[in-house]
Curated annotation (Swiss-Prot):
Amino-acid positions noted as binding glutathione in the UniProt annotation, renumbered to this chain: 315-319, 378-381, 428
Phosphotyrosine: residues bearing it: 340
Residues the record lists as Phosphoserine modifications: 336
Mitochondrial matrix side: 23-140, 207-259, 312-382, 431-752
Name under which the protein is recorded: Iron-sulfur clusters transporter ABCB7, mitochondrial
Interval spanned by the transit peptide: 1-22
């Protein structure tokens, strides 16, 4: 009995240690779960008016930030940022999907309302019992069989104790009289004790085999769910990703998959078996010892369960607060580390650390509440069980005194109850963790329910296109990111197959929006877009995006080798094809000069490469994709003139015999375009060739051209003035040197 009590105490201590370890591990993951930056394209065109409104709110942001530090409350940073113009605009976006739920963005007090336990478990069990995997179903059935065997062996163990004690004390009328013990030990007791050992070994064997058999089912289910969520996130539209923080999504998926692993084991091998074992024990006590024993046992178990459920539901709110603080801390860490250079530029290391520490402080507060209430829960559980055990032992003692029960019955009752204490202690832990895991899983399965606004029509046909038919046409296209703020208003134009067309205009005129609409990142509110004479909404997304290549303004590369990033344009390409496109983009020789050649790591987002090298990689992988249509979204706007001219040369070679659209800010890069389309206030204001547009001195294009030319000329004049000043100083220095030399001519002695 003492040994069983010690084991029970160790189990409770282990449960407490497990939860504390889990809490501390969450903080560590905030720093190490750094993932890709995801999509970074701007979600809307703010224009000059947006910039003006932004500058007007700078002072209010500064005041809000100062108050936040005075109150030492990290949450006020988010409140202060809401005064920025971008925040209300984002909240009004037509592509806004709302919050994911399950603690990702939820209010801690409302988080539990989003958890539909029945639907979550039903969705999870569809992965455990898949219709297309009879092998996994067989494993589940075998595991349940081993589970039943293990529980049966557990119930047999106390009976072995009972029979052993009764055999050793078979002299009726003399309680604990062991005068003939040597004879009984040699016969019945020895056999019973051997049976006791076999029963315990059998129970352990069944449990371990069950775990081994079910392991493949659990891991396969987790892998399939994680893969489906990952693929689903990639299938969601750009608007969803622009309204989500990558760090929060990553943590939600991580916690959700870990929650699935726990719930699978708890539900199949803990909760249901515990209920089965409690029912079996109560029935045994009823038939062997009487109704009083069964009633006390059921009362104890009922009080224990009710107390555990009530307190755990109360404690769950602290877990939701911990999740939210964990998300905020993770986002702060990821954003700060991804913007390492920006932090250094402004010497804001301490600011970032204090901001991060504010979120950790919130997490710490919620974690302390969770830990303290856990201690209260454990004490209450122990008190309830101790009262029930005491009552059962008193009843058993009275039965022995009355002659209705034997000493073996006392040992059996004690063993059955202590055997229940292990699953009961585990029941508390299982319920707490299951409840919390369901909250984590809710976010995961909620993500699976988010429907993308951009998807194929039913029975969408693949795009039929060749380089000879790759005509692009916009027909009266209207589009707005934010309701009531037009970005494109009735835009119509056509790009003939094999021609180069440039689209220019001021900031916020809708140039880059055309690229996103053609690639179907968004859908126009009105009008149609045609590629090769086919409405892009009627063809499959996969075939459409395979036919269009994009060289973005900011080429974000994977944290991998140069070869991997080049191969990404066509993962089935041969090494020779990769080398060929690198040569065409003028990148091959530069790669060979690197220490590791094509195996050189490019760093996070490709930051180890120069801007020109990143753009060449983007061009090369677009070539490797070999699409009939290529889009250049201001691909050289951030480069110097020499690098820009070199890359433009590579572009000219690429676009030969292809349909190409150049989104340009520098007009000098598109003077050779077959047609130039000028956008102004979301409309096609002008169109024509470079020289044709310049012929009209009052045209928008002509004004833009002369403005840029004047800026370049002034820059050149400043350079020439600096050069002349340098030359005049050099001439003055030479003249002075000649005077010094002439002054020492004479006898040849410097002292003359």
């Amino acid at each position: 009995m003492a040994l069983l009590a010690i084991h029970s105490w160790r189990w409770a201590a282990a449960a407490v240690a497990f939860e504390k370890h889990k809490h501390s591990a969450v903080l560590t993951r905030s720093l190490v779960s750094i993932c890709g930056s995801g999509l970074r394209w701007s979600s809307y065109q703010s224009g000059a008016s947006g910039s003006a409104r932004l500058s007007q709110t700078t002072e209010s942001l500064r005041n809000s930030t100062q108050q936040r530090w005075e109150k030492n409350n990290s949450r006020q940073l988010l409140d202060a940022s809401k005064v920025l113009q971008a925040w209300p605009l984002i909240e009004k976006r037509t592509c806004w999907h709302g919050h994911a739920g399950g603690g990702l963005h939820t209010d801690p007090k409302e988080g539990l309302k989003d958890v539909d336990t029945r639907k979550i478990i039903k969705a999870m069990l569809s992965y455990v019992w898949p219709k297309d995997r009879p092998d996994l179903r067989a494993r589940v059935a075998i595991s349940l069989g081993f589970l039943g065997g293990a529980k049966a062996m557990n119930i047999v163990v106390p009976f072995m104790f009972k029979y052993a004690v009764d055999s050793l004390n078979q002299m009726s009328g003399n309680m604990l009289n062991l005068s003939d013990a040597p004879n009984t030990v040699a016969t019945m007791a020895t056999a019973v004790l051997i049976g006791y050992g076999v029963s315990r070994a059998g129970a352990a064997f069944f449990n371990e085999v069950r775990n081994a058999v079910f392991g493949k089912v659990a891991q396969n289910s987790i892998r399939r769910i994680a893969k489906n969520v990952f693929l689903h996130l990639h299938n969601l539209d750009l608007g969803f990703h622009l309204s989500r923080q990558t760090g929060a999504l990553s943590k939600a998926i991580d916690r959700g998959t870990r929650g699935i692993s726990f719930v699978l084991s708890a539900l199949v091998f803990n909760l249901l078996p515990i209920v089965f074992e409690m029912t079996l024990v109560s029935s045994v006590l009823y038939y062997k010892c009487g109704a009083q024993f069964a009633l006390v046992t059921l009362g104890t178990l009922g009080a224990y369960t009710a107390f555990t459920v009530a307190v755990t539901r109360w404690r769950t709110r602290f877990r939701i607060e911990m999740n939210k603080a964990d998300n905020d801390a993770g986002n702060a860490a990821i954003d700060s580390l991804l913007n390492y250079e920006t932090v250094k530029y402004f010497n804001n290391e301490k600011y970032e650390a204090q901001r991060y520490d504010g979120f950790l402080k919130t997490y710490e507060t919620a974690s302390l509440k969770s830990t303290s209430t856990l201690a209260m829960l454990n004490f209450g559980q122990s008190a309830i069980f101790s009262v029930g055990l005491t009552a059962i032992m008193v009843l058993a003692s009275q039965g022995i005194v009355a002659g209705a029960l034997t000493v073996g019955d006392l040992v059996m009752v004690n063993g059955l109850l202590f055997q229940l204490s292990l699953p009961l202690n585990f029941l508390g832990t299982v319920y707490r963790e299951t409840r919390q895991a369901l909250i984590d899983m809710n976010t995961l399965f909620t993500l699976l329910k988010v429907d993308t606004r951009i998807k194929d029509k039913a029975m969408a046909s693949p795009l039929q296109i060749t380089p000879q038919t790759a005509t692009v046409a916009f027909d009266n296209v209207h589009f707005e990111y934010i309701e009531g703020q037009k970005v494109l208003s009735g835009v119509s134009f056509e790009v003939p197959a094999g021609k180069k067309v440039a689209i220019v205009g001021g900031s916020g005129s809708g140039k880059s929006t055309i690229v996103r609409l053609l690639f179907r990142f968004y859908e126009p509110q009105k009008g149609s877009i045609y590629l090769a004479g086919q409405n892009i909404q009627d063809v499959s997304l996969e075939s459409l995006r395979r036919a269009v290549g994009v060289v973005p303004q900011d080429a974000v590369l994977f944290h991998n080798t140069i070869y991997y990033n080049l191969l990404y344009g066509n993962i089935n390409a041969s090494p020779e094809e990769v080398y060929a496109v690198a040569k065409l983009a003028g990148l091959h020789d530069a790669i060979l000069r690197m220490p590791h050649g094509y195996d050189t790591q490019v760093g996070e987002r490709g930051l180890k490469l120069s801007g020109g090298e990143k753009q060449r990689v983007a061009i090369a992988r677009a070539i490797l994709k070999d699409p009939p249509v290529i889009l250049y979204d201001e691909a050289t706007s951030s480069l110097d003139s020499i690098t820009e001219e070199t890359i433009l040369g590579a572009m000219r070679d690429v676009v030969k015999h292809r349909t190409s659209i150049f989104i340009a800010h520098r007009l000098s890069t598109v003077v050779d375009a077959d047609e130039i389309i000028v956008l102004s206030q979301g409309k096609v204001a002008e169109r024509g060739t470079h020289y044709g547009l310049l012929a009209n001195s009052s045209s928008i294009y002509s004004e833009m051209w002369h403005t840029q030319s004047t800026r370049i000329q002034n820059h050149d004049n400043l350079g020439w003035d600096a050069k002349k000043e340098s030359l005049s100083k050099e001439e003055e220095r030479k003249k002075l040197q000649e005077e010094i030399v002439n002054s020492v001519k004479g006898c040849g002695n410097c002292s003359c």
